[in-house]
Amino acid sequence: GGVGRCIYNCMNSGGGLNFIQCKTMCY
């Protein structure tokens, strides 16, 4: 779904966010 893609994009955007931060943002 879109959440997995959001997390992947978030973690690879160069913003330095970790998985937990990205998961919180993407949900």
UniProtKB/Swiss-Prot annotation:
Q: What is known of its domains?
A: The cysteine framework is XIV (C-C-C-C).
Species this chain originates from: Conus cancellatus
Protein name as it appears in the record: Conotoxin as14a
Membership in a protein family: Belongs to the conotoxin L superfamily.
Report the subcellular localization: Secreted
Q: GO CC: one term?
A: extracellular region
A molecular function annotated in GO for this UniProt entry is: toxin activity
Q: Which cysteines are joined by disulfide bonds?
A: C6-C26, C10-C22
Q: What does this protein do?
A: In vivo, intracranial injection, elicits scratching and grooming activity in mice.
Chief subcellular site? secreted
Keyword Metal-binding applies:
no
